[in-house]
Amino acid sequence: MAHTGSTVCAFLIFAVLKNVFCQTPTSSSEVEDVIPEANTVSDNIIRQQRNNTAKGIHSDPSAFPFRVCSASNIGDIFRFQTSHSCPNTKDKEHNEGILLIFKENIVPYVFKVRKYRKIVTTSTIYNGIYADAVTNQHVFSKSVPIYETRRMDTIYQCYNSLDVTVGGNLLVYTDNDGSNMTVDLQPVDGLSNSVRRYHSQPEIHAEPGWLLGGYRRRTTVNCEVTETDARAVPPFRYFITNIGDTIEMSPFWSKAWNETEFSGEPDRTLTVAKDYRVVDYKFRGTQPQGHTRIFVDKEEYTLSWAQQFRNISYCRWAHWKSFDNAIKTEHGKSLHFVANDITASFYTPNTQTREVLGKHVCLNNTIESELKSRLAKVNDTHSPNGTAQYYLTNGGLLLVWQPLVQQKLLDAKGLLDAVKKQQNTTTTTTTTRSRRQRRSVSSGIDDVYTAESTILLTQIQFAYDTLRAQINNVLEELSRAWCREQHRASLMWNELSKINPTSVMSSIYGRPVSAKRIGDVISVSHCVVVDQDSVSLHRSMRVPGRDKTHECYSRPPVTFKFINDSHLYKGQLGVNNEILLTTTAVEICHENTEHYFQGGNNMYFYKNYRHVKTMPVGDVATLDTFMVLNLTLVENIDFQVIELYSREEKRMSTAFDIETMFREYNYYTQRVTGLRRDLTDLATNRNQFVDAFGSLMDDLGVVGKTVLNAVSSVATLFSSIVSGIINFIKNPFGGMLLFGLIAAVVITVILLNRKAKRFAQNPVQMIYPDIKTITSQREELQVDPISKHELDRIMLAMHDYHASKQPESKQDEEQGSTTSGPADWLNKAKNVLRRRAGYKPLKRTDSFESTGVP
């Protein structure tokens, strides 16, 4: 991120510089008043400086190229860590040895898989007058049985037919509507080298029938074999192919009786093939060595891969770093491992991990070869002290520790063991002798030798213990001094950055950078390198102008060009070949002044603010303040990047989870496939129904086409009506109108219901609304109600009258139905004609009214 931000800063600075200085090109007189001598940094020095920067060698600041720097607030932000905690190793036991560090392998397990399937394409072709057309096309794929995959993997051949059972009926699809035969597989060109495909039919069979205006169904069967890579990550519960297929099982599943690997696929779809052979296409027909292969039938395709075992094929740990000068310190219940080559320490529990080599056989060769190479480097001074030890850190690292002992200590211990052995031998021999032999002359010599051996033993033991304690003390002091020195250096850099942040950061980076303190942090940005051949210093350092005769530049003015720019720009030469962007660094002119300015490989001498001569930089003596310490130089310390965010946090930070998306997509695709299979078993598959109906209509010829067109027209009409209603409802105004009508209907129903309730409660008031007025004015109008007997007579008369009218109405309806016929239709037609002429039918009257006319 730092390099990216600095690059962006450099481009922004370059753009700002072009906008600022494009309007101030130098005049011709200023161009002529430049120093003609060579004054630029040579290409060889620039190239050497860049190579040194790439190798981590800090170059002389005077060899930096001419450049324009600007401390921008948008640069990379840094701060110095001023608080460190050094380990307290006092009175601790220190051991030196070889440290091997293994990190957890996050690279997925990659293996080869093969995908087999047969793709069936059924097309309905219309033979038109002017052109043919594909009116319908259905594509589906099916898996391939193992007996046929053997032919595909060995001789690259397959059968061009497919048998499918639908609703208890066997359907046979044959390529080009021909007969079943063996066809060859041919390679297919692809974009990726990791995916290779072979197929048998590259073209779709779409030839129309011989009947003009007729429909014909064509079938294409294509055998396809895809060889690609699959990836799996721990805990190996699924793997994904490069073409997007997901298998919910471990790639190390083997169907063993004590199987521990996960398998989420149905057992009926899994097959283990023994002595299976896969041949490369170039060597088809040969007989390679057989192997065990796993097959899974996904209904739409078959997938296979070679059986592998986890502890052999996949290694959980990957070698990261090795150190032959590490220190192990015991701190109570934990162990601290420190190496001078990296700025980090590792701590683990003081218990070893026993099951590492048993579960991960792949580590044996790596550990053995790495230990052998590291021991060869320290073989002259150290020797192994015991066997290798294995520890696991809390961060998930595996540490392999091989204790070492110095050769001097080993020689001293060998001498001590030899003396002890000789002393024990002498003691044993003395006890077996008789008392008479103990009084012999030689017994005095043996006693003296035994005493001398005891003294020698104590001296050797003291020397051994003292040397061991001193070595431990030296290792302890080195460990603490190294930590304190790093802390002091960090504090020193922090304080120096307050004085000149650009020099400090350039020294740390080893290349020219621009730095500026913005509060408590430092903003660092790249410098823009100008065209080295265009940099020229002016002869005079006096400020031009009549009113500025007493002013002179404190730094010599310089003209330069940017790379890929033809305009000349003016500035002032700064320190270490830096070009200042302004010409405001002026001072009052003094008499008899001398100035020396370094630019590139030359030193420019100015007398009275006028250039006098140019001399090489080497002619000026240097003040050597470097004190050489005649010791072996400390090895370089490379700062390692500390992982701020864990792998899980990085995975969760993205908005797209590609693995989950693919798994869910394939999962629901398989669910739809299962649903389609169920529908096929129930003989209600829509595609099969449409295909069967289309075949029936084709067999009927013209009649079938007429029926098909009529059915299509009716279906289209109803579809248009339904679609129109749905679209009308979807429209905002239509939806509001519909809701308004529904509300009106609901209100009408409520009002009618209330009216019916009122009629049932008080029918007389509903029929005669003036009954209340009559009741209130009964005394004034002197109206007396009839008796209940008279009321019953009136109600009975009304009932009888209504009962007598019902048979007559039924007879009129029956007579009307009997008279309805051709004559009735004729009378109706005549009535229509009469109405057009202006005639109207007469109104009927009751019989008693007609008879009453005189």
Curated annotation (Swiss-Prot):
<feature type="compositionally biased region" description="Basic and acidic residues">
    <location>
        <begin position="802"/>
        <end position="813"/>
    </location>
</feature>
<dbReference type="GO" id="GO:0044175">
    <property type="term" value="C:host cell endosome membrane"/>
</dbReference>
<feature type="region of interest" description="Involved in fusion and/or binding to host membrane">
    <location>
        <begin position="209"/>
        <end position="217"/>
    </location>
</feature>
<feature type="disulfide bond">
    <location>
        <begin position="315"/>
        <end position="362"/>
    </location>
</feature>
<keyword id="KW-0812">Transmembrane</keyword>
<keyword id="KW-0261">Viral envelope protein</keyword>
<feature type="disulfide bond">
    <location>
        <begin position="69"/>
        <end position="527"/>
    </location>
</feature>
<feature type="glycosylation site" description="N-linked (GlcNAc...) asparagine; by host">
    <location>
        <position position="385"/>
    </location>
</feature>
<dbReference type="GO" id="GO:0020002">
    <property type="term" value="C:host cell plasma membrane"/>
</dbReference>
<keyword id="KW-0946">Virion</keyword>
<keyword id="KW-1039">Host endosome</keyword>
<feature type="disulfide bond">
    <location>
        <begin position="552"/>
        <end position="589"/>
    </location>
</feature>
<feature type="glycosylation site" description="N-linked (GlcNAc...) asparagine; by host">
    <location>
        <position position="564"/>
    </location>
</feature>
<feature type="topological domain" description="Intravirion">
    <location>
        <begin position="754"/>
        <end position="854"/>
    </location>
</feature>
<dbReference type="Pfam" id="PF17417">
    <property type="entry name" value="Glycoprot_B_PH2"/>
</dbReference>
<dbReference type="GO" id="GO:0044178">
    <property type="term" value="C:host cell Golgi membrane"/>
</dbReference>
<feature type="transmembrane region" description="Helical">
    <location>
        <begin position="733"/>
        <end position="753"/>
    </location>
</feature>
<feature type="region of interest" description="Disordered">
    <location>
        <begin position="802"/>
        <end position="829"/>
    </location>
</feature>
<keyword id="KW-0472">Membrane</keyword>
<keyword id="KW-1160">Virus entry into host cell</keyword>
<keyword id="KW-0945">Host-virus interaction</keyword>
<feature type="signal peptide">
    <location>
        <begin position="1"/>
        <end position="22"/>
    </location>
</feature>
<feature type="glycosylation site" description="N-linked (GlcNAc...) asparagine; by host">
    <location>
        <position position="424"/>
    </location>
</feature>
<keyword id="KW-1043">Host membrane</keyword>
<keyword id="KW-1032">Host cell membrane</keyword>
<dbReference type="GO" id="GO:0016020">
    <property type="term" value="C:membrane"/>
</dbReference>
<feature type="region of interest" description="Involved in fusion and/or binding to host membrane">
    <location>
        <begin position="125"/>
        <end position="131"/>
    </location>
</feature>
<protein>
    <recommendedName>
        <fullName>Envelope glycoprotein B</fullName>
    </recommendedName>
</protein>
<dbReference type="GO" id="GO:0019031">
    <property type="term" value="C:viral envelope"/>
</dbReference>
<keyword id="KW-1015">Disulfide bond</keyword>
<dbReference type="Pfam" id="PF00606">
    <property type="entry name" value="Glycoprotein_B"/>
</dbReference>
<feature type="region of interest" description="Hydrophobic membrane proximal region">
    <location>
        <begin position="679"/>
        <end position="730"/>
    </location>
</feature>
<feature type="glycosylation site" description="N-linked (GlcNAc...) asparagine; by host">
    <location>
        <position position="630"/>
    </location>
</feature>
<dbReference type="Pfam" id="PF17416">
    <property type="entry name" value="Glycoprot_B_PH1"/>
</dbReference>
<feature type="short sequence motif" description="Internalization motif">
    <location>
        <begin position="839"/>
        <end position="842"/>
    </location>
</feature>
<feature type="glycosylation site" description="N-linked (GlcNAc...) asparagine; by host">
    <location>
        <position position="364"/>
    </location>
</feature>
<dbReference type="InterPro" id="IPR038631">
    <property type="entry name" value="Glycoprot_B_PH2_sf"/>
</dbReference>
<dbReference type="GO" id="GO:0055036">
    <property type="term" value="C:virion membrane"/>
</dbReference>
<feature type="glycosylation site" description="N-linked (GlcNAc...) asparagine; by host">
    <location>
        <position position="379"/>
    </location>
</feature>
<feature type="topological domain" description="Virion surface">
    <location>
        <begin position="23"/>
        <end position="732"/>
    </location>
</feature>
<dbReference type="InterPro" id="IPR035381">
    <property type="entry name" value="Glycoprot_B_PH2"/>
</dbReference>
<comment type="subunit">
    <text>Homotrimer; disulfide-linked. Binds to heparan sulfate proteoglycans. Interacts with gH/gL heterodimer.</text>
</comment>
